[in-house]
Amino acid sequence: MANILEVKTKDGKLIRLTEKQWLHIKRRHPEMTTKIGDIEDTIANPTVRIQHSDETTKFYKFIKDEKKYIMVAVKILNGHGFVITTYKTRRL
């Protein structure tokens, strides 16, 4: 399956957004369908980055006009990163 997006994190890890996950995001979070650029920017230049113990990292970027964060959840396994989901939230 093709990748919709490939972007590097500040520490050089390559993160991919696959077509399969993009379909999931569009179905579950339709407000994100026009936000590919924001998703890319959130991964590349997050306001906040929270690493969890299960190989999941959450990247947040504050959107001033909306007073919300874009959250992008990423899983990194064996050096390969991929987007799990993304949505807007008021909380970290």
Per-segment meaning from a language model:
Residues 1-92:
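Ribonuclease/tRNase effector modules and their secretory precursors
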